[in-house]
């Protein structure tokens, strides 16, 4: 009888150890499958799933899912690198409570089939209404302005200079023009006299709404709200 009890105890310990060690691996693979079925692609991908205690993962709950990807793309968004942590994750229903992360080298699709770039995008907050902070550097702004001026049938600016708190100065055909940035209908625009230039408009496939804009000496910061749950359904 004592021998049988010993065998049972050892079997139970082995099962617990297997669940402790194996649960994160099983959960990681499940997250990878969920990402692929949502349309997410990446040239490199690392996923770490954690729960305390780890066997909770076998019940479909994860405290955190940490995703690091290079060359990432999903729907109307591409990024050179992505580093996201999802919290309070239900693996079965593929839902999560909040997100905190960063995109570097982001390219965002627009309705006309073009893209605009943001050197860095920070995302933090609840799943369906996370705050997105887009940081636009000089290269991002030049590309936006050249495209917008071209669409308006005007000569592309040769230089751009931030003028805090809300303006950009551009040099066009040797002349200096100053435009005021604003958000109009979810798009980033610049008003130069009577001319309204549309600089950035997230496309319909990307659940991102631009809401605020500010100009600093180092560039432009655009604030918005993104539905990450809709981005990674």
Language-model regions: role of each:
Residues 46, 64-68, 83, 169, ...:
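Beta-strand secondary-structure signal
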Residues 189-233:
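Extracytoplasmic/luminal low-complexity segments enriched in Pro/Gly and acidic/polar residues
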